[in-house]
């Protein structure tokens, strides 16, 4: 559960940087 949240935040951060 905790890892799922961490991965979600990482994906959002990557997408934000990316864009």
Swiss-Prot record:
Binds 1 pyruvoyl group covalently per subunit. Transmembrane segments: none annotated. The keyword Cell membrane does not apply. The active site is at 1 (schiff-base intermediate with substrate), 15 (proton donor). GO terms for molecular function: adenosylmethionine decarboxylase activity. It catalyses: S-adenosyl-L-methionine + H(+) = S-adenosyl 3-(methylsulfanyl)propylamine + CO2. Keywords: Autocatalytic cleavage, Decarboxylase, Lyase, Polyamine biosynthesis, Pyruvate, S-adenosyl-L-methionine, Schiff base, Spermidine biosynthesis. Is synthesized initially as an inactive proenzyme. Formation of the active enzyme involves a self-maturation process in which the active site pyruvoyl group is generated from an internal serine residue via an autocatalytic post-translational modification. Two non-identical subunits are generated from the proenzyme in this reaction, and the pyruvate is formed at the N-terminus of the alpha chain, which is derived from the carboxyl end of the proenzyme. Heterotetramer of two alpha and two beta chains. S-adenosylmethionine decarboxylase is essential for the biosynthesis of spermine and spermidine. The alpha subunit contains the active site. This is S-adenosylmethionine decarboxylase subunit alpha. It comes from Acanthamoeba castellanii.
